[in-house]
C-alpha cells in the first residue's frame, strides 16, 4: 500500500518497522532481502525513486514501512519539501511504530541529515537501530574503518549486504525482539 498523504496510512493498528535513510543507501534492496521477495520494493540506481510511504504487510502481523530517501534526488525542490513533510507527519504521529531502521551507506558513513534524524529519534525516545548497507562493496580494512566511524556516534551498527545476505539474521533478530510482547 502506498500513501502520499497521512489519511492514506493503514488504520489496522498493526506494529510498524520503518526504514529511513538518504536516497540510494539501499533501503529498498534491504527490504527485498529481508522479505525474501526480489521485487517487493522497487529498486533503482536513480536517487529519489521512492516518492510515497510504502507499507508492506509481513505475514499479516506487522508492516515494513519504506520511507522516501532524504538528501540527493533529481526532483524539484517542491517535491523534496513535500516528502520531508510527509515523513515528519508519519514519524510524529505513528503510534504503532515499534522500530526505526536508520540506514547508512557503509562507504559514506554519517551525513548531517543522518545525525539530525538520529538526534530526533533519541529526543522523542523512539527505538532505532543503525544498519550499514553496501558492505560487500568494501574490502576488509574499509569495512573496519567504516564501522569505526559509525560507532563514533555511540551506536553499534548492523552491517548488511543485499548481495550476500550478510547481516540479515541480526536485523531480523532486532526486529523480532522489538515486536515481542513485553
Could you tell me what each predicted segment is?
Residues 1-7, 137-182:
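Canonical P-loop GTPase G-domain recognition
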Residues 1-74, 180-181:
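Conserved G1/Walker A P-loop phosphate-binding module
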Residues 8-12, 46-54, 68-98, 106-120:
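Switch II of P-loop NTPase G domains
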Residues 13-15, 34, 77-80, 115-119, ...:
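Short, glycine/charged-enriched secondary-structure capping and boundary segments
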Residues 34-38, 91, 154, 175:
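Hydrophobic aliphatic residues
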Residues 39, 72-75, 111, 139-140, ...:
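Conserved protein kinase catalytic core
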Amino acid at each position: 500500500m502506498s500513501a502520499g498523504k497521512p489519511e492514506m496510512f493503514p488504520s489496522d493498528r498493526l506494529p510498524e518497522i520503518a526504514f529511513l535513510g538518504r536516497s540510494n543507501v539501499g533501503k529498498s534492496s534491504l527490504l527485498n532481502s529481508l522479505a525474501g521477495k526480489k521485487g517487493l520494493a522497487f529498486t533503482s540506481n536513480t536517487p529519489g525513486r521512492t516518492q510515497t510511504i510504502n507499507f508492506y504487510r509481513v505475514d499479516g502481523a506487522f508492516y515494513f514501512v519504506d520511507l522516501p530517501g532524504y538528501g540527493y534526488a533529481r526532483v524539484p525542490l517542491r517535491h523534496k519539501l513535500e516528502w520531508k513533510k510527509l515523513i515528519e507527519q508519519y514519524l510524529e504521529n505513528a503510534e504503532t511504530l515499534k522500530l526505526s531502521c536508520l540506514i547508512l551507506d557503509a562507504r559514506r558513513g554519517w551525513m548531517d541529515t543522518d545525525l539530525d534524524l538520529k538526534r530526533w529519534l533519541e529526543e522523542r525516545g523512539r527505538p532505532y537501530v543503525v544498519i550499514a548497507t553496501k558492505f560487500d562493496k568494501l574490502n576488509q580494512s574499509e569495512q573496519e574503518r567504516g564501522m569505526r566511524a559509525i560507532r563514533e556516534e555511540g551506536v553499534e551498527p548492523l552491517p548488511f549486504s543485499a548481495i550476500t545476505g550478510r547481516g540479515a539474521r541480526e536485523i531480523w533478530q532486532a526486529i523480532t525482539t522489538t515486536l515481542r510482547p513485553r
